[in-house]
């Protein structure tokens, strides 16, 4: 019976994968991780990977699939942080959903298109693919009906 336990432990160890992302500054890490590492906890929970800050690196551990998913999400969210955008729970969950569907590139594409500016100069951007499709339809067509 001890041999079975040893084999299970070694199989589990072999299945563990690691990935790393490099952070340019501590400010980026703080903005990405959020208050009391709340964002980090959401990314971990949504991807199933363990995320550890080590100096200027973010080390990601988990199964090959979980580690790759978490790395993709972290890298895309770092681009968001570098653009000066805020990262919150809903944005993280949406980014994870897009990455799971294989549409990780759309995470940064959504944020690049400014729809309008407020009176105070803040940018209004699409937050979901549905909003982006709607705005593109408004730009292309004379009449657009929105339901819902």
Model-identified regions with their sequence ranges:
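Pre-Walker A segment
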Residues: 102-147
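Short amphipathic alpha-helix segments
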Residues: 28-45
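Extended, non-globular interaction scaffolds
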Residues: 2-3
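N-terminal assembly/transducer modules of large multi-domain enzymes
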Residues: 45-47, 54
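Interdomain "pre-motor" coupling segment immediately N-terminal to P-loop NTPase/helicase cores
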Residues: 52-111
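Flexible hinge/switch segments at interdomain interfaces of large molecular machines
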Residues: 6-17, 111-113
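Short glycine-/aliphatic-rich beta-strand segments at the starts of folded cytosolic domains
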Residues: 11-31
């Amino acid at each position: 019976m001890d041999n079975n336990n040893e084999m299970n432990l070694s199989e589990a160890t072999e299945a563990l994968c690691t990935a790393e992302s490099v952070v340019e500054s501590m400010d980026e890490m703080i903005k990405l991780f959020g208050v009391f590492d709340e964002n980090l906890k959401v990314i971990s929970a949504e991807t199933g990977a363990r995320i550890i800050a080590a100096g200027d690196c973010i080390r990601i551990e988990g199964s090959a699939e979980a580690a790759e998913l978490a790395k993709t999400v972290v890298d895309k969210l770092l681009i968001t942080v570098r653009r000066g955008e805020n990262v919150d729970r809903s944005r993280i969950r949406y980014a994870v959903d897009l990455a799971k569907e294989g549409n990780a590139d759309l995470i940064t594409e959504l944020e690049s298109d400014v729809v309008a500016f407020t009176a105070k100069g803040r940018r209004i951007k699409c937050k979901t693919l549905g909003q982006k499709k709607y705005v593109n339809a408004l730009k292309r067509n004379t009449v657009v009906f929105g339901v819902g």
